[in-house]
Amino acid sequence: MKKITGLLLAMIFLFVFSGCSTENDLISDFDAVGDMEISSLDETPTHVEMPTKIQTPSETETSSNNETPIYVEMPSKIETYVETELNDYHNVVQAQSSTPDVPTTFEPIIDNNFSGGNGTQTNPYLITTPEHLIYLSSKINSGKMNNGAYFALGADIDMAGVEFTPIGNGDHRFSSNFDGRGFTISNLSPKLLYDDYGNNANYSCGFFGIVGNAEIKNLCLENVNITYTYDSNYFTEIGILAGCVYPTRECKITDCIVNGNINVSTDVLLVGGIIGDIFANDDVKLEFARIQSNTKLQVRGDSLEVGAISGSLLADGEESFSDIFAQSEILHNSMYYSHVGAFGGVSNRKGNVNVSNCFIKINTNKKHGDEINALIGGMIETYQPNGRFNFTNVFAFADSCTKLYDIPSENPVKEENCGFTDVLPSTCNFNTEIWDITDPASPFIKFNF
């Protein structure tokens, strides 16, 4: 019996060490991907063989530094894997929030770190300097500012040369009210930081990091520049206005001007000219209205969701997008696939997506494996497609494609007066009290700032 036991132990010993060799090979494979540099967006990325096993983020979180990581088998298709992980990622973000995005009682208090105000609707905290914005970011991100406060700009602010961390993160979303009052924040360069899968980190980058139950209005962002390169297998959400919009009840963003550039490179990217990732769970209501943007997005990675409005849209609630003019130059280079459109990748399991009176113009490139459509780049197939889409007076154009969307037949789609065009037709039916369409190729929104 001892001989048999010894033989079994020897076999196990050999098996374990042979497995360790495989794990070392795995690490080498990941290093090969991480070390790969793409010198030009016009170059085809060098193909790197995917490892047969990959460590999942959820398992990384639960294992200590002294434990051997657990590995799971790699799905046969990288796109299916990425889409599955996108769903898991949203669940992780929701679970990790240490301060639930629910109403809290805000107690008005004078804070001399602002120019004035006590944080109420009638007397908001007044922001007039870069230092005020930095202070606001630190208060929100550390959880030292209760949800429901009111903030307002009192002057134009030049952020050139100022180090700035996005407002709102995975632990503490921005769930308050921000009124730009028509003032402009210019030359902003938000930085993006990583920790363990977003723990206490700003993995969502923009002027705002993660936005929760909030209202943002009358804000102008000019010459925002986000440059970022990171070798990781984490999801990264980047948008000029906000990296991620992730409320539990309601979020409203209206009357905003967004202009800037994004130049980023990492594994899996959700990048939007306005918002990187929009996640609307059950019973959530989202409203985006009267927004004008002009952006340039240069994106490199393994798998990409890129949009002139939003890189990714998960729509399980009631989502409304109206009177939006989004222009974007999108240069993308992915190793596996890209979804590119006004909304890059969309999932609509049971939501109601309403898009009306919108004009989108996209100048982009296309390579083998990319899915490009002017309005909805591609559907995220993991989710069961039984949500509703309503498109009214929507006109969009993108290079390298000929249609607005390619939505599965299971999704009810109601389309009225829409078209694939880079010039607004005379029959666009846009409200001229909101739009100036003197030049139908370059209309603009009449803001009441």
Where are the regions that the model predicts?
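N-terminal cationic leader/targeting segments used for protein routing and processing
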Residues: 3-4, 25, 54, 66-67, ...
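Sec-dependent signal peptide recognition
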Residues: 2-10
